[in-house]
Amino acid sequence: MGRDTIADIITSIRNAHMDKKGTVRIASTNMTENIVRILLREGFIENVRKHRENQKNFLVSTLRHRRNRKGTSRTILNLKRISRPGLRIYSNYQKIPRILGGMGIVILSTSRGVMTDREARLEGIGGEILCYIW
């Protein structure tokens, strides 16, 4: 039985966010790099760097926190895995769901790579719905 690396990323980020940790260490694969790149571009994480330890590559990402007078407070971050190895969920570009009326994002795996729902609608392609982030 294989590992679900996307669920591992989502769980790691969610746990670090709930525990108010600043950084998350994620195993590096092509899929995880693409998802983290989207999270970085959309502003859900602050910084990403590659780290090599014992012949294995990792991504160390810094979570984004707001600063206010009382100190740092965390931004509201919710992640939900949709398509999973036991039940794949596909959608064409017209039926890609909108999260919170467009405030959240949907990450899709398409024939042209991993992209957000906005990019998929602009290009007119659908794909496998990996996760929701809001």
Swiss-Prot record:
Gene Ontology, cellular component aspect: chloroplast; ribonucleoprotein complex; ribosome
Main location: plastid
One Gene Ontology biological process: translation
Subcellular location: Plastid, Chloroplast
Keywords per UniProt: Chloroplast, Plastid, Ribonucleoprotein, Ribosomal protein, RNA-binding, rRNA-binding
GO molecular function terms listed in the Swiss-Prot or TrEMBL record: rRNA binding; structural constituent of ribosome
Positions in coiled-coil regions: none
A Pfam family reported for this protein in Swiss-Prot or TrEMBL: Ribosomal_S8
InterPro entries: Ribosomal_uS8, Ribosomal_uS8_CS, Ribosomal_uS8_sf
Functional summary from the UniProt entry: One of the primary rRNA binding proteins, it binds directly to 16S rRNA central domain where it helps coordinate assembly of the platform of the 30S subunit.
Family per similarity comment: Belongs to the universal ribosomal protein uS8 family.
Subunit structure: Part of the 30S ribosomal subunit.
Name used for this protein in its record: Small ribosomal subunit protein uS8c
Annotated organism of origin: Piper cenocladum (Ant piper)
